[in-house]
From Swiss-Prot:
One of its GO terms (biological process) is translation. Coiled coil: none annotated. Belongs to the universal ribosomal protein uL4 family. GO terms for cellular component: ribonucleoprotein complex; ribosome. HAMAP family: Ribosomal_uL4_B. InterPro entries: Ribosomal_uL4 (IPR002136), Ribosomal_uL4-like (IPR013005), Ribosomal_uL4_dom_sf (IPR023574). One of its GO terms (molecular function) is rRNA binding. Keywords: Ribonucleoprotein, Ribosomal protein, RNA-binding, rRNA-binding. Part of the 50S ribosomal subunit. This is Large ribosomal subunit protein uL4. One of the primary rRNA binding proteins, this protein initially binds near the 5'-end of the 23S rRNA. It is important during the early stages of 50S assembly. It makes multiple contacts with different domains of the 23S rRNA in the assembled 50S subunit and ribosome. Forms part of the polypeptide exit tunnel. SUPFAM superfamilies: Ribosomal protein L4.
Length: 210
């Protein structure tokens, strides 16, 4: 399929052919969600923990005699129903990770890229060379693509991200810049618009079409 390649001034430079097996697939939200859940699960530290009756500090003495007080019988001040007692069925330290096959992870990335292209939210530019590391310069250029604090931009460069572009982008809210090897479904779907250089698009083609 043919797509237009722009420069950062939003001028059309040329048209290129992109592999439809990477950029023109049917939308599969189920697979995209599976991989996003996998990404977020790997981020969780899993250090949440509560104390059971055995972990609570305190006496093991019976609080009062079994019969004759008129109260409900109690065996321990550390029981779950007592104030300051243990927690029943609370969270424990564990890993939230689960396995997703590499093939499915690659498919999810292709589906995410295809979806953004289908809704005209994937922009291919010739390069990210802005000639300056000033944030104001980059912000004025991106305004031509309707960038604002409320519309996130996810920029994908080839192996080596342009240094000036990277430095200028650091102070911009809701704008992330990565090399193409770091492209992932979560960031693509999270941001409103995806901007990818032509060389990065070709590298993604080679990596994902295998």
């Amino acid at each position: 399929m043919k797509v237009k390649v722009y420069n950062l001034l939003q001028e059309i430079e040329k048209e290129v052919e992109l592999n439809p097996s990477v950029f023109c697939l049917k939308y599969r939200p189920d697979i995209i969600k599976l991989v996003i859940d996998w990404q977020l699960a790997k981020r969780m530290s899993g250090t949440h923990c509560t104390k059971t009756i055995s972990g609570v500090s305190g006496t093991t003495k019976k609080p009062f005699k079994q019969k004759g007080t008129g109260n409900a019988r109690q065996g321990s001040l550390r029981s779950v129903q007592m104030r300051g007692g243990g927690i029943s069925h609370g969270p424990v330290v564990r890993s939230h990770e689960f396995d997703v096959p590499k093939k499915i992870r690659k498919q999810a990335l292709k589906y995410a890229l295809s979806y953004k292209l289908s809704v005209n939210k994937l922009i291919v530019v010739d390069d990210f060379n802005i000639g300056s590391n000033k944030t104001a310069v980059l912000k004025n250029l991106l305004k031509k693509y309707n960038y604002s604090n409320y519309s996130g931009f996810f920029c994908i460069d080839d192996q080596n991200v342009d240094r000036n572009f990277f430095l200028a982008s650091r102070n911009l809210f809701n704008l992330n810049v990565v090399a193409q090897i770091g492209a992932n479904p979560y960031d693509i779907m999270k941001h409103d618009c995806v901007m990818v250089t032509l060389s990065a698009a070709k590298s993604l083609e080679m990596r994902l079409a295998e």
